[in-house]
Regions:
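Conserved beta-strand position repeated across blades of beta-propeller domains
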Residues: 42, 94, 139, 210, ...
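Short glycine/acidic-enriched loop and turn motifs that connect beta-strands
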Residues: 56-60, 108-111, 154-157, 225-227, ...
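Short beta-strand element of the alpha/beta-hydrolase
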Residues: 429-440
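Non-catalytic accessory segments flanking enzyme active sites
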Residues: 42, 58-60, 148-150, 157-159, ...
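Multi-bladed beta-propeller domains
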Residues: 23-37, 63-65, 72-89, 106, ...
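Residue-level detector of Asp-centered blade-edge/turn motifs that repeat once per structural unit
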Residues: 45-46, 97-98, 142-143, 213-214, ...
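Hydrophobic beta-strand positions that form the internal "hydrophobic ladder"
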Residues: 47-50, 99-103, 147, 215-218, ...
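Active-site-proximal cap/loop segments of hydrolase catalytic domains
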Residues: 454-464, 469-668
Length: 668
């Protein structure tokens, strides 16, 4: 069966009163923030229509949010219209098997996500569920009579009473609110009601799931607790769709993302073959529903396959994976062999969905200079036809060209990255360069649209005559397991050589000016930025975004305490020297690079204290430094006004300390 769905307190905030609706003549953060995000596709069972979701930034008055709505486009490109409206987001559209209904998620009429139903060609949406704690995932039964969903255990009456009376002390790692499986009938009973039926219970947390083709079973993955740190405990089980005992299917840990075969006799799933590491691998396996040993289907390029479903004839499994700088869709034969690429050509492909007969696909495609749009193609031969014009009112300014470049690191390892040149680039001129480092460290820079609003406004930097280098150093995804693990026990050294090697290449080519360098990054990119400025004074300015600056205190305060002990072969008390050697905080003496530190107040992944430690260390040494803390913000900024603020602050900081000017704007 195929599921349809898409593929990481300001101390002083000023300048937000400037209208974000002014019409700049070149790329600026104000221009880029208007970008609407295309979230994914859901093609109808007959392949004739595609539902897709667009998230629009709202910045008027007190608003600072993204609101998503569902649109519908004909596969022949002749019709395209907005389906849902309102002041609450509507996401995750899923077609009923007969194509007569679309189910979607929304918090309409409350503050919790529930499942809603709507006719695709007219009529009002109808609320299906009344999930007290909100619906997580959902999926139609193959016969269209029921929908399965997951919901976290709600608060008990006593817990609600305690909350009201301020008796709500929290005991850490106890009383988890596990997610469990439920079903609900689409048709109302004789009393005009719909009642959800709970299928699972107990001390485990349900993640992904799929229906059997005969509607009798649900296969699901589950882990020990909802904690992010417990992902290695993933198992796969079966449960009868009408209620009954849970039946273990895959007892090997780190098993996830199960899908039934079209004949209902097999389940495909992702598994790491016991090679469980945070710099992970996910191979594709199949197992009989009657049990037995799982069988590995074959090797994929990056061994990080995200299973998308089966072909209608049951001979192939579809999956998504990044190949170097291009996210793509692939198929691999269940009998084994090499994968075949379904989405050929340059750029990035994602948000894919398939018709019921798997003869037609819908996919979101984009390139560095081309906006993301929905395309439809035959599965026999990839010949995508564009059927949407999302962001038709988005600025059409001249763009800085982006290309993939390669270089050799100090140890001879080949490194790849993306360079975005200034708008109106002149080959005889040397430009200031910004080294932008991705997160992860197992992230990857891909060939996505560079005009999109993001933490770092690429085209605004290009319009301001900066060259932007985005390397994929050792530790990145997209280049295989060995490359992804090449930075184990080596953060800040081999990857440092990789990053600096790309900078040196652009200097040698006469593209970048050696005395006008800046560096920035978020998360692991923030770690790398903080560590780089402890090793060299070549950079005139730096910006550390939600960066890990002290490996020891990070391990003791983050929501993933198992992360760094895996990378550094033990806990801090067992390998103290490594944690000190690879931490900016233990090498911070003498740092003089002007540094802008940006951090979310509610960041659980990299707690705010990481930014505060580095800020205080630089402040005590009279190094130019500014710490900006964003209220309500988790590990990445979610509010468009904050994204806008970050972009403007970054540009101002680099202009001030790289070029010796600030463009007439304040930097504090």
């Amino acid at each position: 069966m195929l599921r349809h769905g898409p593929f990481v307190k300001a101390l002083l905030l000023v300048g937000l009163a400037v209208s974000v609706f002014a019409q700049p003549t070149k790329w600026t953060p104000e221009a880029m923030i208007k970008y609407k995000r295309l979230l994914g596709t859901a093609i109808s069972p007959d392949g004739k229509w595609v539902a897709y979701t667009v998230s629009e930034p709202l910045l008027e008055g007190e608003k600072s949010e993204y609101r998503a709505q569902i649109f519908l486009a004909a596969a022949d490109g002749k019709m395209d219209f907005q389906l849902t409206q309102g002041d609450k987001s509507c996401t995750n559209p899923q077609w009923s098997p007969d194509g007569k209904w679309l189910a979607f998620s929304s918090s309409r009429g409350g503050d919790k996500n529930n499942i809603w139903l709507i006719r695709p060609f007219g009529g009002e949406a109808e609320k299906l569920t009344e999930a007290k704690s909100g619906v997580n995932n959902f999926a139609w039964a193959p016969d269209g009579k029921r929908i399965a969903f997951t919901m976290n255990n709600p608060l008990s009456e006593q817990e609600e009473k305690d909350n009201k009376e301020k008796r709500d002390a929290i005991v850490v790692d106890e009383n988890f609110k596990f997610a469990h499986l439920y079903t609900i009938s689409v048709e109302k009973n004789e009393k005009g009601e719909r009642k959800a039926k709970r299928l699972t219970s107990g001390d485990f947390h349900v993640g992904g799931f799929d229906w059997s083709p005969d509607n009798k079973w649900l296969v699901f993955d589950h882990q020990a607790t909802p904690r992010v740190n417990d992902w290695p405990t993933g198992l796969i089980s079966l449960v009868p769709a009408d209620s009954g005992a849970v039946k273990p299917l895959v007892a090997k840990t780190m098993a996830n993302n199960p899908y039934f075969s079209p004949d209902g006799q097999w389940v495909a799933f992702g598994h790491d073959a016991g090679d469980t590491r945070w710099a992970g691998r996910t191979d594709i396996y199949v197992v009989s529903i009657n049990g037995g040993a799982p069988r590995k289907v074959g090797e994929t390029h990056d061994q990080q396959a995200n299973i998308l479903g089966w072909s209608a004839d049951g001979k192939e499994i579809f999956y998504g994976e990044t190949e170097r700088t291009s996210p793509r869709v692939f198929a691999i034969a269940v009998s084994g062999g090499k994968p075949r690429t379904l989405t050929t050509g340059s750029g990035a492909f994602g948000g894919v969905s398939f018709s019921a007969d798997t003869k037609t696909m819908a996919v979101v495609h984009q390139t560095p200079e081309q906006l993301p749009q929905v395309y439809v193609s035959s599965m026999l031969k990839f010949a995508p036809v564009k059927i949407t014009t999302v962001n038709r009112d988005f600025p059409n300014h001249a763009m800085g060209r982006t290309e993939v470049i390669k270089w050799k690191s100090k140890d001879g390892k080949e490194i790849e990255g993306l360079v975005t040149y200034p708008v109106n680039y002149v080959a005889s001129r040397k430009y200031p360069l910004v080294l932008n480092i991705h997160g992860g460290p197992a992230g990857v820079f891909t060939e996505g649209y560079t005009g999109a609003s993001s933490i770092y406004p690429l085209q605004a930097l290009a319009a301001a005559n900066y060259v932007v280098l985005r390397p994929n150093p050792r530790g990145s995804s997209g280049y295989g397991v060995e490359f992804r693990r090449a930075n184990i026990n080596d953060w800040g050294f081999g990857d440092y050589d990789d990053d600096i090697g790309g900078v040196d290449l652009l200097i040698e080519k006469g593209v970048a000016h050696p005395d006008s360098l800046g560096v920035c990054g978020w998360s692991y990119g923030g770690f790398m930025t903080s560590f780089i400025i402890t090793r060299t004074k070549r950079f005139k300015a730096a910006s550390v975004g939600a960066g890990v600056t002290n490996l020891m205190s990070f391990t003791g305060t983050a929501d993933i305490p198992g992360f760094l002990p895996d990378y550094f072969f033990g806990q801090p008390w067992d390998n103290l020297a490594a944690y000190q050697k690879h931490s900016a905080m233990f090498n911070v003496k003498g740092v003089s690079t002007p540094t802008l530190i940006l951090h979310g107040e509610k960041d659980l992944r990299v707690p705010l204290s990481q930014g505060q430690e580095f800020y205080n260390a630089l402040k005590q040494q009279n190094c130019p430094v500014q710490l900006v803390v964003y209220p309500r913000t988790p590990h990445g900024p979610q509010e468009p006004k904050f994204i806008l603020d970050i972009g403007n602050r970054l540009l101002d900081w680099f202009d001030l300390y790289i070029r010796g000017k600030n463009g007439g704007k304040k930097t504090s």
